[in-house]
Swiss-Prot record:
SUPFAM superfamilies: Aminoacid dehydrogenase-like, N-terminal domain (SSF53223), NAD(P)-binding Rossmann-fold domains (SSF51735)
Keywords of the record: Amino-acid biosynthesis, Aromatic amino acid biosynthesis, NADP, Oxidoreductase
Source organism per UniProt: Bordetella parapertussis (strain 12822 / ATCC BAA-587 / NCTC 13253)
Stated name of the protein: Shikimate dehydrogenase (NADP(+))
Pathway stated in the Swiss-Prot or TrEMBL entry: Metabolic intermediate biosynthesis; chorismate biosynthesis; chorismate from D-erythrose 4-phosphate and phosphoenolpyruvate: step 4/7
EC numbers for this chain: 1.1.1.25
Binding annotation for shikimate: 20-22, 67, 93, 108, 228
Keyword Oxidoreductase: yes
Protein family membership: Belongs to the shikimate dehydrogenase family.
HAMAP family found in the cross-reference section: Shikimate_DH_AroE
Biological process, per Gene Ontology: amino acid biosynthetic process; aromatic amino acid family biosynthetic process; chorismate biosynthetic process; shikimate metabolic process
Pfam families: SDH_C, Shikimate_DH, Shikimate_dh_N
Length: 287
C-alpha cells in the first residue's frame, strides 16, 4: 500500500513569532486554491537564524516567510539569487528553495500597492508622503515607483536617515519618472497637499502618531498606516483630524504580501478579499 505524500512544508520564521497570522492566512489560501500545504510558525533564536533555516530545509521545507528580526540575514542568505524587488529593498521576506538554493524576494511593497489599488487609489501621477526611513519604508519604494507615483517624499524624525534612504534609492534604482526627496518630519507639508500619506513607522504600536505638521492632505487623500488593529490607529486618528478624506490600516497589506508569497511558491494567485474580510471580522470581534 502506498502512503499518501506529505503536503509541501512552509513556515514563517521570526522572533517573536507566536503572534503571526501567517499560518491562518496561508491555510485559507490553501483551501481557496485547492493547493495542500503544511504551514507553521518557526521560532528561531536571535543568533540562530541560519541553523534554524538549515534544519527546516533538511526536514523538507520549501519556503519561508521571514519577519523581524531576520530580513537582513535572509537577504544575505540569498544574496546571489535575489529578485529586483529584494535587491532594492535591501531585505528579504520570502525565501524559496529552487534548483538546490534559496532564492529571495520581498513582497511587502507589492502587498502595499495592491491594497492601495483595492482601496481605489490612483497611484499613477500620485504625490506620496512616506513617513519613516527604516526597512519598511525602503521595502515599498520600488513598487510605489513602478506603480507610477510622480513624487515620493520621505520624512523621518532623524532627517539624515531620510536623506540617506533617498540618496541610496537614487543611486541603486532604475531610472523612473518618480521624484524621490527627503526631509524632517517638520518638512512634510506640500503645497496642494499629498494624495497619499503612508506611515511606515511602528509608532502606532505605542498608540502614538509621528510628530507631523497639519495641512498635509489634498482633497480625497488617503492616509495609510502599515500597522493595524481592531480600532483606528493613532496615525489614522491624527490624519482624520487633519482632514484626510479616507484612512486605512495595514491589514490588507499583510494579506497582500502573503498572497504574493503564495503565488511565488505555488504559481497560483489567490484572492485576498475573502481572507481580508475574515481577518477583519475576527479583529473586530476580539476588539
Amino acid at each position: 500500500m502506498t502512503l499518501p505524500a506529505s503536503p509541501p512544508r512552509y513556515a514563517v520564521i521570526g522572533n517573536p513569532i507566536a503572534h503571526s497570522r501567517s499560518p491562518q492566512i496561508h491555510a485559507m489560501f490553501s483551501a481557496q486554491t485547492g493547493r495542500p500545504l503544511r504551514y507553521e510558525r518557526l521560532l528561531a533564536p536571535v543568533d540562530g537564524f541560519l541553523p534554524t533555516v538549515q534544519a527546516f530545509r533538511e526536514s523538507g521545507g520549501l519556503g519561508l516567510n521571514v519577519t523581524v528580526p531576520f530580513k537582513l540575514e535572509a537577504y544575505a542568505l540569498a544574496e546571489a539569487r535575489l529578485s529586483e524587488r529584494a535587491r532594492l529593498a535591501g531585505a528579504v521576506n520570502t525565501l524559496s528553495w529552487r534548483d538546490g538554493a534559496w532564492h529571495g524576494c520581498n513582497t511587502d511593497g507589492v502587498g502595499l500597492v495592491n491594497d492601495l489599488l483595492r482601496l481605489g487609489v490612483a497611484l499613477a501621477g500620485a504625490r506620496v508622503l512616506l513617513v519613516g526611513a527604516g526597512g519598511a519604508a525602503r521595502g515599498v519604494l520600488q513598487p510605489l515607483a513602478a506603480a507610477g507615483c510622480a513624487r515620493i517624499h520621505i520624512v523621518n524624525r532623524t532627517a539624515a536617515r531620510a536623506a540617506e534612504l533617498a540618496a541610496a534609492w537614487r543611486a541603486a534604482a532604475p531610472r523612473t519618472g518618480t521624484q524621490v526627496s527627503a526631509g524632517a518630519l517638520a518638512q512634510a507639508a506640500e503645497p496642494g497637499g499629498w494624495d497619499v500619506a503612508i506611515n511606515a513607522t511602528a509608532s502606532s504600536l505605542q498608540d502614538a502618531a509621528p510628530d507631523l505638521p497639519g495641512g498635509l492632505y489634498a482633497p480625497d487623500a488617503l492616509a495609510y498606516d502599515m500597522m493595524y488593529g481592531a480600532r483606528p490607529t493613532a496615525f489614522m486618528r491624527q490624519a482624520e483630524a487633519d482632514g484626510a478624506a479616507r484612512c486605512a490600516d495595514g491589514l490588507g497589506m499583510l494579506v497582500g504580501q502573503a498572497a504574493e508569497s503564495f503565488h511565488i511558491w505555488h504559481g497560483v494567485r489567490p484572492d485576498p478579499g475573502p481572507v481580508l474580510l475574515a481577518l477583519r471580522t475576527e479583529l473586530l470581534a476580539a476588539g
